[in-house]
A protein has these predicted regions:
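Catalytic phosphate/metal-binding cores of nucleic-acid and nucleotide-processing enzymes, i.e., regions
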Residues: 1-133
Length: 133
């Protein structure tokens, strides 16, 4: 998986393990850890993955769903947009528009990143907490 040079990556790009946890499991662990360690934070997961019928995709688009939207949005100034990938990034792929979404959000003042696994995502959240107002 090729990373865009303008998007901050948390985690090791050289880590390899074919048995590394799936992205969904990493995301659930992140949610549990953030709620446990930082219960005051407001954040949400954007359900923008999976197969959809054309009718469902059209409905979601009409309701404001954006192709490529990040997995997590943490509310604050600036907001943090976090794209979660598997710890072994060779087992992950970019979906269409994900990198473009992050770059556009970054241009508008958001802190954006890709996190390889939940531990890397926690590091990103902790870094963001040091700069947010």
């Amino acid at each position: 998986m090729k990373m865009h040079p303008l998007i901050k990556v948390y985690g090791s790009l050289t880590y390899r393990d074919p048995k590394t946890a799936k992205e969904d499991a990493e995301a659930m662990t992140l949610v549990n850890q953030v709620k446990k360690r930082f219960p005051h934070l407001l954040f949400m997961h954007i359900k923008n993955e999976g197969k959809k019928t054309k009718a469902q995709a059209d409905f979601d688009k009409a309701m404001g769903m954006l192709a490529g939207a990040s997995d997590f949005v943490f509310l604050g100034t600036p907001p943090l947009l976090l794209e979660m990938k598997r710890k072994d990034n060779t087992l992950s792929t970019w979906q269409p528009n994900q990198q473009m979404f992050l770059l556009k959000a970054q241009e508008q003042g958001c802190k954006v990143c890709v996190a390889l696994g939940w531990e890397a995502a926690m590091e990103a959240v902790e870094d963001w907490m040091r700069i947010k107002k």
